[in-house]
Amino acid sequence: MRLTAKQVIWLKVCLHLAGLLPFLWLVWAINHGGLGADPVKDIQHFTGRTALKFLLAALLITPLARYAKQPLLIRTRRLLGLWCFAWATLHLTSYALLELGVNNLALLGKELITRPYLTLGIISWVILLALAFTSTQSMQRKLGKHWQQLHNFVYLVAILAPIHYLWSVKIISPQPLIYAGLAVLLLALRYKKLLSLFNRLRKQAHNKLSL
């Protein structure tokens, strides 16, 4: 049985709740001592993990829609991507304001250079910013064929974000490894497309070098 347009609307409502409820829990935890001994780190890790969850969920939609034969499921992909960007922005903001502090924001550039895992994180965020800004149908029409080329960069985020997470933790625990494994699995489901993209980029690079 295929999803109807009305069911997709209700599914989107549920996804909005899934994006909002963690924020409400975080606010409650901050105000009621629900965080650990290092609340700043807990906030950073919580916001980062939530962003990663929405990224993986967005990547899951296409293969799920294909294998389950639910084409309307694709309509939820943009929403998941926007929630991923929202939580990634909270993650970046929590680092800038809580870790560095308002008076030390000038140090952010130095931090990005001296801590490579932060570089991976900011690259991922900039890509997500571009994808969020161009996610509307009007931008899709305006960019034409370049729209898909731009949004293929989500696969780069799917590589960089788990590495950023793994690199940022001092002690490797099962959790970041699970996220990394899920990202690898979701990318593996697209190996034909990724191989095609790689070959196209290699051909373009070869042509430019030959000029």
UniProtKB/Swiss-Prot annotation:
Keywords of the record: Cell inner membrane, Cell membrane, Electron transport, Flavoprotein, FMN, Heme, Iron, Membrane, Metal-binding, Transmembrane, Transmembrane helix, Transport
Q: Give me the Gene Ontology terms describing cellular component.
A: plasma membrane
Q: Which cofactor does it need?
A: FMN; heme b
Entry's cofactor comment: Binds 1 FMN per subunit. Binds 1 heme b (iron(II)-protoporphyrin IX) group per subunit.
Xref: InterPro entries:
Fe3_Rdtase_TM_dom (IPR013130), MsrQ-like (IPR022837)
Query: Pfam families given for it?
Result: Ferric_reduct
Location (main, coarse): membrane
Q: Where in the cell is it found?
A: Cell inner membrane
Task: Tell me the GO molecular function terms.
Answer: electron transfer activity; FMN binding; heme binding; metal ion binding; oxidoreductase activity, acting on diphenols and related substances as donors
The answer to keyword Lipid biosynthesis applying to this record is no
Residue ranges spanning the membrane: these are 8-28, 54-74, 82-102, 116-136, 153-173, 178-198
Instruction: Tell me how this protein sits in the membrane.
Output: Multi-pass membrane protein
Q: Share an example GO biological-process annotation for this protein.
A: protein repair
What domain of life does the UniProt record list for this protein's source? Bacteria
Q: How does it assemble?
A: Heterodimer of a catalytic subunit (MsrP) and a heme-binding subunit (MsrQ).
Q: Which family does it belong to?
A: Belongs to the MsrQ family.
Query: Which purpose does this protein serve, as stated in its record?
Result: Part of the MsrPQ system that repairs oxidized periplasmic proteins containing methionine sulfoxide residues (Met-O), using respiratory chain electrons. Thus protects these proteins from oxidative-stress damage caused by reactive species of oxygen and chlorine generated by the host defense mechanisms. MsrPQ is essential for the maintenance of envelope integrity under bleach stress, rescuing a wide series of structurally unrelated periplasmic proteins from methionine oxidation, including the primary periplasmic chaperone SurA and the lipoprotein Pal.
Protein name as annotated: Protein-methionine-sulfoxide reductase heme-binding subunit MsrQ
